[in-house]
Curated annotation (Swiss-Prot):
This is NADP-specific glutamate dehydrogenase. The gene is gdhA. It catalyses: L-glutamate + NADP(+) + H2O = 2-oxoglutarate + NH4(+) + NADPH + H(+). GO terms for biological process: glutamate biosynthetic process. Homohexamer.
Length: 450
């Protein structure tokens, strides 16, 4: 890759997968899979385009738009659209690469992709966002379709933006099809879709707790980072299951519960309203229940049983990982994609090996936060059949998918990774190997490598 420009985020994601495969017996037992790794690491297609739009002052603005169609071995490309000034090809390649294996772990027939633009919706009016979405879809519509590529939302692309994008696609292509997921409930959306990533994350961790013989979420203290969609619904589900949530955060700092205080569903609802207005957590009125720590993430300020990073990539550093271990945390699962740095993962995995059943247990995002794309896949199925399932039906299917993802991550390392008696299986190794083998096998059957 030396002839290519540096892509640090993508290289981190690739190296994390490659090192897991190298440190297992997979290549020893199946040396041909080395070829598959080379092939799967290059996207099938990368689409890059300009997005020209007009602001409220009638001034021309231009942004870069992208769609990385990474792998379609298991089904149509599937992955979100992100609108954020930090969006670039490296970030989207990392997200798309992770998405391939995450989608494989759901058991649904969906491939992997990711897209977005370096557009910042903060400070923009509804009309400006609508005009941007229409211009963005003018080009994207040439490359997507219900059986080709089905984008969804991601950071700064919620129900409003999905609506604008869907309306633009319908007008341009003159057809109504399930080309986007995360749609409104009255026009093709699925119940539980907004909640799915957060709920699924908690369902996954519940299996970890149960497997470890520690009962359930009842009475557990939970630290959550972020205050967007994933963090909100993870917090609400934790509270519903009897846990105590003691932190949320945003890009400016962390809100930490003081003394015996904890977040209530009402608190989470008020924070959700602030976030809809794109306001900071500093605007949250709480009567002194919480302390806002500017410029800091929650991990070094809390003593908890469960840590759920739900904000963005690389939000748990080596030092923060060591702090969580020292304070007695037992479970960490990524609600965000690549939420932990590789150095942090190394800390957690070393503890797992050394302290066995007394260790902290780490679950990677490609398994733990697969609930969102899982329900997106269920939305695609409902659109294809022109039906809508009830909330209970979708929730039960989500629970089954998260249970299967956990069990796959649990059983796979027993075949490929040496472990001592009493040691928890490596969920990162199990998830990486299982997802990779499923995709590589399908690609081999299609003649993508030989």
């Amino acid at each position: 890759m030396s002839n290519l420009p540096s892509e640090p985020e993508f290289e981190q994601a690739y190296n994390e997968l490659a090192s897991t495969l190298e440190n297992s017996t997979l290549f020893e037992k199946n040396p041909e899979y080395r070829t598959a790794l080379k092939v799967v690491s290059i996207p099938e297609r990368v689409i890059q385009f300009r997005v020209v739009w007009e602001d409220d002052k009638n001034q021309v603005q231009v942004n870069r738009g992208y769609r990385v169609q990474f792998n379609s071995a298991l089904g149509p490309y599937k992955g979100g659209l992100r609108f954020h000034p930090t969006v670039n090809l490296s970030v989207l390649k990392f997200l798309g690469f992770e998405q391939i294996f995450k989608n494989a772990l759901t058991g649904l027939n969906i491939g992997g992709g990711k897209g977005g633009a370096d557009f910042d919706p903060k400070g923009k009016s509804d009309n400006e966002i609508r005009r941007f979405c229409v211009s963005f879809m003018r080009e994207l519509s040439k490359h997507i379709g219900a059986d080709t590529d089905v984008p969804a939302g991601d950071i700064n692309v919620g129900g409003r933006e999905i609506g604008f994008l869907f309306g633009a696609y319908k007008a341009i292509q003159n057809k109504w099809e399930g080309v986007l997921t995360g749609k409104g409930g009255s026009w093709g959306g699925s119940l539980i879709r907004p909640e799915a990533t957060g709920y699924g994350l908690v369902y996954y961790v519940a299996h970890m707790i149960q497997y470890a013989g520690q009962g359930s979420f009842q009475g557990k203290r939970v630290a959550i980072s972020g205050s967007g969609n994933v963090a909100q619904y993870a917090a609400l589900k934790c509270i519903e299951l009897g846990a105590t949530v003691v932190s949320l955060s945003d890009s400016q700092g962390s809100l930490i519960a003081e003394g015996d205080a904890y977040f209530t569903p009402e608190d989470v609802g008020k924070i959700a309203e602030l976030k809809l207005k794109r306001q900071s957590l500093t605007a949250f009125e709480h009567g002194g229940k919480y302390k806002y720590i500017e410029g800091s993430r929650p991990w070094t300020h809390v003593k908890v049983d469960v840590a759920l990073p739900c904000a963005t990539q690389n939000e748990v550093s080596k030092e923060e990982a060591e702090s969580l271990v020292a304070s007695g945390a037992r479970y960490i699962a990524e609600g965000s994609n690549m939420g932990c740095t590789q150095e942090a993962i190394d800390v957690f995995e070393a503890e797992r090996k050394e302290k066995k059943d007394k260790a902290i247990w780490y679950a990677p995002g490609k398994a733990a936060n697969a609930g969102g794309v899982a329900v997106s896949g269920l939305e695609m199925a409902q659109n294809s059949a022109r039906i809508s399932w009830t909330q209970e039906e979708v929730d039960e299917k989500l629970k089954d998918i998260m249970k299967n993802a956990f069990e796959t991550g649990l059983e796979t390392p027993k075949k490929y990774v040496e472990a001592k008696d009493g040691e928890y299986p490596s969920l990162v190794a199990g998830s990486n190997i299982a997802g990779f083998v499923k995709v590589a096998s399908a690609m081999h059957n299609h003649g993508d490598w030989w």
